[in-house]
């Protein structure tokens, strides 16, 4: 739930759960109305909801955890590519197996824990050649445990899930990926675009022939998080301008949180809004300790507080 504004109703899975804990504020935003326009694909694991925003593209959404992470299964005639594997709370490999039987490679938009939780389940995982990537591939427990705090979960966790042992499990990097690499899925080519900024290893994926751009955490509808120690604001600005230049050839922009589809024009507006933030032309409001939110032209950015705030 990468958005501080809370509105609608979340339906909990049992009256007992309702009695045990209050409904988290972010949960009241659900279900998001944008999903009504998308085709939903049934899968057996109820932790996930799967939607089809474009032909042979499946948005694998985790609505029951506050990150509302979205991974994408992109299917070609011979192979498939999974862009992000989510929180590692549900069984994402089981979901992908229900959607395709083609050989599958995993790529991550970046290696924050909410995007790599299911990596360990897959045999072939490519990663960017950065120390940040290698360090995160060792796994971690502390960050994962924070993600299942009571106010971070809407409803119940999956049957068989053990909160006490939950961690981001280590995974093996099968091969390194670089800017400009292409993945031939058979009748569909996916291009890797390095978009550092949010993290050093952030990437976007371009399906040029079909006009699809998968942006990870470089863009998604909601407050964009740029407050981590690994964030580089100059690199982020350069990356979003690079993506904005692609907008004329796009049909859809597909981000990694909240809602899976946005119009391509959002990229130019995003770049313009961020330029205003850097130029001191955005409204600043305090947020969590050490952080502020800048708001301008319908966008909001969570960033480290400037000196003196």
Where are these predicted regions, by residue range?
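Conserved beta-strand hairpin/beta-sheet module of binuclear metal-dependent hydrolase folds
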Residues: 44-98, 205-220
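Active-site HxH/HxHxD metal-binding segment of metal-dependent hydrolases
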Residues: 89-184, 221, 265, 270-283
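Alpha-helical assembly-interface signal, strongest on the long, hydrophobic N-terminal helix that forms
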Residues: 8-11
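Metallo-beta-lactamase
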Residues: 34-47, 51-55, 80-82, 87-88, 128-193, 199, ...
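Positively charged n-region of N-terminal signal peptides that target proteins for export
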Residues: 1-4
